[in-house]
Amino acid sequence: MMAADRPIVDAQGCITHAPRSRVVDFLRPGDLVIANDAATLPASLQGVHAPSAAEIEVRLVWRASLDAADVHTFSAVVFGAGDFRTRTEDRPLPPFLAPGDCLLLGPLSATIDAVLDHPRMVSLRFSGSPQSVWAGLARHGRPIQYAYMTTPLALWDVWTPIAALPVAFEPPSASFALDWGSIRTMRERGIAFATITLAAGVSSTGDPELDRRLPFDEPYRIPEATASAIHHVKREGGRIIAIGTTVVRALEHAATRDGSARGSREREGASEASGGEAPRALNIVRAGDGVADQRIGPASRLRLVDAILSGTHEPDGSHYQVLRAFMDDRTLADANAALETMRYRTHEFGDSVLIERKVAAATSLSCDSCRPLWLQLCPA
């Protein structure tokens, strides 16, 4: 044990605990830490379904790009009357929705372009200029919130310390573990820091059928400086440390072996079916925009990311599936048992877990006992 009441999982399944403030101690010179700098949109909108005069809540969950001018068309989940104080899974259905219906959302007006393949999910289009849509969201929207947080959240409550472009529908919450002090300490110790931007989606829709589709496709952007830093670190044999599942999703979608752009699930499947990993020094990532449309889970072959700092997640959620790409189920189950014993928090403002990918751990050990696998649970 590293401290009397704090938990790393080694090859023998031994779990160690440490405060989140010590996370930099488990990194090493030559590592590259990459975080998602997306700021969170006020994506929850109370309003009225004009044809029925029924009260509704609209939760924006997707748009096609990160372009600030591309702010008219969204996919959204629509609830009946109520707000976050009622558990999402207990929220009533909206009134019957049809293409052409007008939704009055405070200063904003939106038209349903299409009801998608679920009665609660629609494609809607806001009226007005991009500037007026942004202004209406800022004035009337609130952060998407769930019932376990009983106090209404302000927008700044869901912005991480590195929040920049407002494109996320829920916060990329792993970045709450960062602060400018820890980033400064990283750089003082020869640990590089870079960012990507990915429009983090929602963690729950309240409907089991829709939740099984999560995560929805997520647009992302990888800056040239970040791509260059990745190339340099991999060439020098360093590790890529992803801050959160959204960073893993973006980087693994963009990762290539031959210099061609990552494009489709089919190409990923063909690569995995061919057997074995190419030498990791050959892995590259292209700068630019993309849309992460893949699912990452226990069968995934991670091409680029060596370790992840993540929130602690419920085993039935899509975020947890990403953790299964890094660690075997038995060790994760042991970690979850420790999590419950220590009463760690599992929501977006909860505690953190640091996991090094098992294959990477065998050749890039970072601790005195030469563990081939380690995991760090960090109380807030």
Predicted regions and their residues:
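A cross-family signal for N-terminal binding/gating loops and helix N-caps
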Residues: 1-367, 374-380
